[in-house]
From Swiss-Prot:
It comes from Mus musculus. One of its GO terms (biological process) is adaptive immune response. This is Ig lambda-1 chain V region H2020. Residues 1-19 form the signal peptide. It holds the Pfam family V-set. Residues 20-125 form the Ig-like domain.
Length: 129
């Protein structure tokens, strides 16, 4: 669970990170209950690789943050199996298989660059219910 604390701390401090890399995500996506949805994370420095240790963090409307995925594809303890991380082409991806209304949230991707993390702006996922 230590990596989750690290990610949350870095999320709070990410505005102070100095980097030439920019991490981009879809600003918003909409899905329906039971559908599969994939959120992606791209780097301006080139293809995202396992060396970027892609992390995914969920922010619920009440500002509760939960670390979902670390190291590209390692699900955090207690995270439902419907959440999975991977690399698709040149991007990191978070796939939710069988989305539920409770999955409506903002999802942040963070990529590692040698000595610091860079966060994307987040994807607001709406689950129509």
């Amino acid at each position: 669970m230590a990596w989750i604390s690290l990610i949350l701390s870095l999320l709070a401090l990410s505005s102070g990170a100095i980097s030439q890399a920019v991490v981009t995500q879809e600003s918003a996506l909409t899905t329906s209950p039971g559908e599969t949805v994939t959120l992606t994370c791209r780097s301006t420095t080139g293809a995202v690789t396992t060396g970027n240790y892609a992390n995914w963090v969920q922010e619920k409307p009440d500002h509760l943050f939960t670390g979902l995925i670390g190291g590209t594809n390692n699900r955090a303890p207690g995270v439902p199996a419907r959440f999975s991380g991977s690399l698709i082409g040149d991007k990191a991806a978070l796939t939710i298989t069988g989305a539920q209304t409770e999955d409506e949230a903002i999802y942040f991707c963070a990529l590692w660059y040698s000595n610091h993390w860079v966060f994307g702006g987040g994807t607001k996922l709406t689950v129509l219910g």
